[in-house]
């Protein structure tokens, strides 16, 4: 293509070439969108281009990208209707056609440890974030409750009982780790682990549970304990006859009463009575002498917690079966001791039967006595219903031996109960490129069970109820299925990252449960990482050392990117998978919009590492927005494949150059002008009158094609913002592709040097104030110093 002389732009040959290019651009603009193939059709559209007989399976990508883009303008993809279409594109499938989960009867429940961070972290890591986290609150606008029997989703119809059994074991493991509350009655729950300060005021002694606080099913009939005729408590302590009558009544009624915590599930009939059902009567059997004797075995750790720490009664050795004692006196003894011991509760074992902590202590094979169980009467009622449903899947594609618990609290994010969760800063790729330090060794840390570090207010926990079909549990820590949890985790790790950066003088970046530490000295960074891990563990924050970098490295994988000392890139395996998917596109066939949605998600991730732009994906976005089928054309498939071939890596902390503008453009409804800083100018007449922003963009694109400047001056904000989605698609793609690599500066019309030539006056380059209109990238203050 002929290049103009810098002294003047009015070269005859150059002008003829420029006029030709302008007419091509005008033809693209004048194509009416209603007549194009991008409009949703009422029929399937038989004129869709079909692949030829000799067409190769892989697209031809030898042509330059600019030629491929121009070819798409004549061979457009199409939108269809909402009839059933293909929902498989290579290995991708529609979101509602996910690969069915396979049940594994040998699933193991992963090890879940107690994650209780010390509240001293508020003083060690001062931040305003802690007032939102100690405790976190969750207040949905409205709640839909479901029956307890629907607690486990029927994900595996052929293995319902086994599925529910493993879910029960999983919930038991979470309960034992202090992550769940377990429902005892309408106003009473139990939990394990160390209580928080806000829970201390609601802890209760078992002996203080008032009469009539619970209800239970008796012979299949729901009765209120308050309505039953209780034994009068006016008896004297020395009246042994009345005591023996009470013992007989308690033991005789034992076989008829089910545990009141068996919330609607008869799948695993209990072997003994519940604590909450037997507490009021069994506690009266205890002699005052034994109560005095029990005061000697006070747990020192609980005593230090304050006046609400409770003592445990010593067990007496008995003989007989731990779970099914037929001897009346033994059963009453066990019931009495169980009721009088505030540090014990009924939990689910492997067989969903009462564990060793509630049975006699004479069995040498039984587990040691549980001492970290607490009873809490919150300032709320604990519903015998659930708000979320559960099912199990493989932990990940590489680990199918362990199960992962999926909690469905989608009612809080969609439908009539949808909540607007708070927004928080999350770095995009451009921000990440600018905040990462160049040429520094790096170490990554990963939090273990990150969400389970976040405690919830007990009243909020009652809104997050789940069940295995037998017991009702409430999340004491933040669950992963609620949209509020990522926001809380962001606050949590941000507060920790700020203190780590300040205390250890190291560059720190946090995103969800990932920490990235950078320092110029690798040896110093290695020692810092050990100090940081010790600091976090002293505060009760657990580190996943399996996913933590053991020593400083120069290349690290973070947020899905491969990051070395100077560049960011994407793994080659990901490119190969995407090329394979594009090769399997069948030209002319209709694809379901859900399948296209998944495909666009993969393309969006790699698009910044290509020479393409987001406008190239707009036809697929149109299909997703209108929820209609989509058909690929041959040229469009070639364009997508061409994008994956031009792989590039992005430089970390790119140099921001501000070149001096040397070319300016301007337009009127009838004429356009290009002006050079050397004084040369060229004026063009448009073939028809159009909107002024279209004419301005035409002249800017023409200047880019004919002169190839590093930057351009324009008095159109529409042109400078580079948002062309309102234009016909094929012209928007070309304009975005042409103007993406260069900087556009805005100049007021009265100072635009090209304003004179467009109005048949000489250009004026003496004074022209200009500014870029691109929005500055937001970077947190603590990351701005790098």
Swiss-Prot record:
Region (Terminal protein domain (TP)): 1-200
Record field: compositional bias (Basic and acidic residues): 314-326
SUPFAM superfamilies referenced in this protein's UniProt entry, alphabetically: DNA/RNA polymerases
Keywords linked to the UniProt accession: DNA replication, DNA-binding, DNA-directed DNA polymerase, Endonuclease, Hydrolase, Magnesium, Metal-binding, Multifunctional enzyme, Nuclease, Nucleotidyltransferase, RNA-directed DNA polymerase, Transferase
Polar residues compositional bias, start-end: 207-221
Biological processes, Gene Ontology terms: DNA replication
E.C. designation(s): 2.7.7.7, 2.7.7.49, 3.1.26.4
Region: Disordered, residue numbers: 36-60, 207-368
Functional note: Multifunctional enzyme that converts the viral RNA genome into dsDNA in viral cytoplasmic capsids. This enzyme displays a DNA polymerase activity that can copy either DNA or RNA templates, and a ribonuclease H (RNase H) activity that cleaves the RNA strand of RNA-DNA heteroduplexes in a partially processive 3'- to 5'-endonucleasic mode. Neo-synthesized pregenomic RNA (pgRNA) are encapsidated together with the P protein, and reverse-transcribed inside the nucleocapsid.
UniProt remark on domains: Terminal protein domain (TP) is hepadnavirus-specific. Spacer domain is highly variable and separates the TP and RT domains. Polymerase/reverse-transcriptase domain (RT) and ribonuclease H domain (RH) are similar to retrovirus reverse transcriptase/RNase H.
Protein name: Protein P
Organism: Duck hepatitis B virus (strain Germany/DHBV-3)
Lineage per the UniProt record: Viruses, Riboviria, Pararnavirae, Artverviricota, Revtraviricetes
């Amino acid at each position: 293509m002929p290049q103009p002389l810098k002294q003047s732009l009015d070269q005859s040959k150059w002008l003829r070439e420029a006029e030709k290019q302008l007419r091509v651009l005008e033809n693209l603009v004048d194509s009416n969108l209603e007549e194009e193939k991008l409009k949703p059709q009422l029929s399937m559209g038989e004129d869709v281009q079909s692949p030829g007989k000799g067409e190769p399976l892989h697209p031809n990508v030898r042509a330059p990208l600019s030629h491929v883009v121009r070819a798409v303008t004549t061979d457009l993809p199409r939108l269809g209707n909402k009839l059933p279409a293909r929902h498989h594109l290579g290995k991708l499938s529609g979101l509602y056609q996910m690969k069915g989960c396979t049940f594994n009867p040998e699933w193991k429940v992963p090890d879940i440890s107690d994650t209780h961070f010390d509240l001293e972290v508020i003083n060690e890591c001062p931040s305003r974030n802690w007032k939102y986290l100690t405790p976190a609150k969750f207040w949905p606008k409205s709640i839909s409750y479901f029956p307890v029997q629907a607690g486990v989703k029927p994900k595996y119809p052929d293995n319902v009982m086994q599925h529910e059994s493993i879910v029960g074991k999983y919930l038991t493991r979470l309960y034992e780790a202090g992550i769940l509350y377990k429902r005892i009655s309408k106003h009473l729950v139990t939990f394990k682990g160390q209580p928080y300060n806000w829970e201390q005021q609601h802890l209760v002694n078992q002996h203080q549970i008032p009469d009539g606080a619970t209800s239970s099913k008796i012979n299949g009939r729901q009765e209120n304990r308050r309505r039953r005729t209780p034994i009068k408590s006016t008896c004297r302590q020395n009246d042994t006859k009345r005591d023996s009558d009470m013992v007989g009544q308690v033991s005789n009624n034992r076989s008829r009463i089910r545990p009141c915590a068996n919330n609607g599930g008869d799948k695993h009939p209990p072997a003994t009575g519940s604590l909450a059902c037997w507490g009021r009567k069994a506690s009266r059997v205890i002699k005052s002498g034994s109560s005095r004797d029990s005061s000697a075995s006070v747990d020192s750790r609980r005593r230090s917690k304050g006046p609400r720490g409770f003592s445990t009664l010593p067990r007496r050795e008995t003989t007989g079966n731990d779970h099914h004692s037929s001897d009346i006196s033994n059963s009453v003894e066990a019931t009495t001791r169980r009721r009088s011991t505030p540090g014990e509760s009924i939990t689910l074992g492997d067989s969903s039967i009462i564990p060793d902590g509630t049975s006699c202590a004479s069995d040498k094979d039984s587990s040691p006595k549980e001492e970290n169980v607490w009873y809490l009467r919150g300032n709320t009622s604990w519903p015998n219903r659930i708000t979320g449903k559960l099912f199990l899947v493989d932990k990940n594609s590489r680990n199918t031996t362990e199960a992962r618990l999926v909690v469905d609290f989608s009612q809080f994010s969609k439908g009539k109960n949808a909540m607007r969760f708070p927004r928080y800063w999350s770095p995009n790729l451009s921000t990440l490129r600018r905040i990462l330090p160049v040429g520094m060794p790096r170490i990554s840390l990963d939090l273990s069970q990150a969400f389970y570090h976040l405690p919830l207010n007990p009243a909020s926990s009652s809104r997050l109820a789940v069940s295995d079909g037998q017991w009702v549990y409430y999340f004491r820590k933040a669950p992963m299925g609620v949209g509020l949890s990522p926001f809380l985790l962001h606050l949590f790790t941000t507060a920790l990252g700020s203190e780590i950066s300040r205390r250890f003088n190291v560059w720190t970046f946090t995103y969800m449960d990932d920490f990235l530490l950078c320092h110029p000295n690798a040896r110093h960074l290695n020692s810092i990482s050990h100090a940081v891990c010790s600091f976090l563990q002293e505060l009760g924050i657990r580190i996943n050392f399996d996913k933590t970098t053991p020593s400083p490295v120069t290349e690290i994988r973070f947020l899905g990117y491969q990051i070395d000392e100077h560049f960011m890139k994407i793994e080659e395996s990901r490119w190969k998978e995407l090329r394979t998917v594009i090769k399997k596109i069948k030209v002319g066939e209709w694809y379901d919009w859900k399948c296209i949605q998944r495909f666009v998600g993969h393309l969006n991730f790699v698009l910044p590492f290509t020479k393409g732009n987001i406008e190239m994906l707009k036809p697929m976005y149109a299909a997703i927005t209108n929820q209609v089928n989509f058909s690929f054309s041959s040229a469009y498939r070639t364009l997508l494949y061409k994008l994956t071939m031009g792989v590039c890596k992005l430089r970390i902390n790119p140099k921001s150059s501000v070149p001096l503008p040397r070319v300016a453009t301007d337009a009127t409804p009838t004429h356009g002008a290009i002006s050079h800083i050397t004084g040369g100018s060229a004026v063009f007449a448009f073939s028809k009158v159009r909107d002024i922003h279209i004419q301005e963009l035409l002249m800017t694109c023409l200047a880019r094609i004919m002169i190839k400047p590093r930057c351009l001056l324009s008095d159109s904000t529409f042109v400078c913002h580079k948002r062309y989605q309102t234009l016909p698609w094929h012209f928007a793609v070309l304009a975005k592709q042409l103007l993406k690599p260069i900087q556009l500066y805005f100049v007021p019309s009265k100072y635009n040097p090209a304003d004179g030539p467009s109005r048949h006056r000489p250009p004026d380059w003496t004074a022209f104030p200009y500014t870029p209109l691109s929005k500055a990238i937001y970077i947190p203050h603590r990351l701005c110093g790098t």
